[in-house]
Amino acid sequence: MRFDTVIIGGGLSSLVCGIRLQKAGRKCLIVSSGQNALHFSSGTFGLLSRLPDGTPVDRPLKAMDELPSGHPYSKIGIEAVRSYLAQVPPFFKDCGIELYHGADEEANGYRMTPSGSLKPAWFSLTDNTLNSSADVRFEGKALIVNFAGFLDFNTSFVAAGFEKRGASCRIETVRHPAVERLRVNPSEMRSVNIARVMDREDNWKQFVNLVKEKMHGEEMVILPEVFGFGNPSVMLWICEMIPAKVIFVGTMPPSVPGMRAQLLLKKAFEEAGGTFLPGDEAVSAEVEDGRISCIRTANLGKVRLESDCFVLASGNLFGKGLVTTPERVYEPVFGLDVEYPSDRTLWYDSDFSSRQEYLGFGVRTDSSFRALRGGEVVPNLFVIGSELAGCNTLAEGSGAMVAILSALKVSDEILQ
């Protein structure tokens, strides 16, 4: 089988790249092995919250001047980063996903996490409340409502986070008949299953009535982010019907807004004419005259997937885009050059909460994100997303936007 572009990986970066190329007339194939990081996404997209040395960042665009030359943002260039950032909201809107930025165009916004802390973000789905400052205050009384038996929304943590910032919180649980049926099997009490139940109009309206019964004049009502899986408008309707300011706070994974975003992006790719190959993974490649001529997958066996261009977006260690042994780290499909320290004791920190260097391992590329193999550029193989060397996206809080911006950059390179 032959395509204009074959993309390996089914996550955020591969879908953005595939949609962009497909809409430009390229015949694209995405090979996806399964779940991706969007399933664990909060529904917010971070641009940069810390420099590599750990310095907190409030104004990411200004701070990018301090990034090393090998960082993906440095390779894209600050002016191109600004241009791509302006393209992101309309791009996602065309896919059925509404994004917004905080009040200050140059600064990070801040969202409340399931642990009750504030985390920086650049863009947010409309599901989330993006606060303009890390010093935000929540004055007044707040009612935190959870479903009985739903353990992935820790109301005590959430209450502590809001009370630390001025709110007076009260916690209540509700027993919704449709959700109670899920409790027969404890493994079914997960955010996505509740969200599917709450997609029904009679169910979410009944939930609103249960919340109203628990209210005693609170100015704020805080709810778990388990609504709008099939239709995000449900959240707007809930906000309209509850006589207080409604704040949705994310739950522990799986993430309802993240999974909805993944489904909408996949739908946009397929509606544009792209081919999505789920439940499969690239296992080998053939190289001719320094160029990739084809790949083979686990399920298709001897069938050659040929293309003019290949894009590697299979993630780092999380997505099996990189593989480790006690002695080395390698890229398993193409044998690409991987950047990592030879001293294994430098791969990790014994303090779990500290910066973990192994999360910054990645494939070496040139300034256009073409992969390096044996020190030589592979002209028709590009790398995007978290598989790129030069950044530790988890420590920097840059994962989503590195994925999106590198995908936009590479799609432009391919279309030139």
Segments from the language model and where they lie:
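N-terminal Rossmann-like FAD-binding beta1-loop-alpha1 element of flavoenzymes
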Residues: 3-30, 411
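Short hydrophobic core segments
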Residues: 5-8, 29-31, 282, 304-316, ...
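Conserved N-terminal glycine-rich FAD pyrophosphate-binding loop of Rossmann-like flavoproteins
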Residues: 33-69, 178-194, 401
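Glycine-/small-residue-rich beta->alpha transition segments that form the dinucleotide
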Residues: 34, 257, 299-302, 307-309, ...
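A conserved FAD-binding loop/helix module that cradles the flavin
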Residues: 42, 319-326, 379, 386-416
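Helical element adjacent to the flavin cofactor pocket in flavoenzyme catalytic cores
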Residues: 153, 157-165, 197-221, 227-285, ...
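Conserved beta-strand-loop-beta-strand element in the redox core of flavoprotein oxidoreductases
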Residues: 266, 283-304, 310
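FAD-binding beta-loop-beta segment adjacent to the flavin cofactor pocket
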Residues: 301-302, 338-343, 347-396
